[in-house]
Amino acid sequence: MYLLSFILGGLNTLLRQLRLSISSIDFYKDVYKNYQGYGIKYLFTLSFIPSIIYCIFILNYIITLKDYFNGTSSSKVTDNIEYIINQLPKIKYNNSKISVEEVEPIYLYSKNNNKIFVIDTKNQVSNQEKSKVPFVLEENKLKINLVSNTKKHFPSIVNYSEIFKQNEVILTPEIIKKYFADNLLYAPNLFIFFGTPVIILFWFVTFLLERSIIVLLVYGLANLLTTKTSIQTSIRLVMFSSGIPIILQPVIIILIPELSILIQLLQMFTTFLVFVAILQINKSLSHI
């Protein structure tokens, strides 16, 4: 009973701080004068919440893929994968190289008619065109074109010899499904025990580094325009002003990445509240 009361009390305090961080200048005055520490524990707590949500999305996707390749279930996501796999021609793999009998290049499309794969073992497609396709099957390697939220491309290359253990095999949709079924068998457990901690740490470090510039801005302007403000106080103010943006950022990236700009605008607004609070504190001190 005590533990439940402690958790509910902590949750109530956290929700109150989040609400005030986007609505109250007095809240930041209180953080400035009465709060202690750097606010790093607060940042970690907040980054932990969206990280877990992010991990749940990924874990659910991994389980969906695992069930699909094992033939136990299907969904709208896996229907699209099935549609793409069924377009595959017969691919011969021999001594780390692939070849096809059909005329190349061969494009595989999603149900929305987007290019997902291109098979180009003879290197007939330009690099510019290849960069627009997520998966490129060349003669001796698979090229994966990752695209960030800034639309920048980050190609990743995997040699076929790293994927297939046999020296010679004919790749059909059935063999490919079996390959993924075997490799995804323990994927959910591996993700829970290894992937989840990495993602939690990644988001925490990312949020911390992103706020470092804001900390320097607050520290510099606060000391330039008002009374002396310590770096510890500046860090604490920025950590508490970042609550709502931190919680929303991973969720928006997953569900509606087009609205990522709202996170930046919200952070700018809460930082503005911080500056107003500092100016008002300085004004009150000057009248003493």
UniProtKB/Swiss-Prot annotation:
GO terms for cellular component: plasma membrane. It is a multi-pass membrane protein. The chain crosses the membrane at residues 43-63, 190-210, 243-263, 265-285. Pfam families: DUF1189 (PF06691). InterPro entries: DUF1189. It is found in: Cell membrane. The keyword Cell membrane applies. The keyword Cell membrane applies. Keywords: Cell membrane, Membrane, Transmembrane, Transmembrane helix. This is Uncharacterized protein RP489. It comes from Rickettsia prowazekii (strain Madrid E).
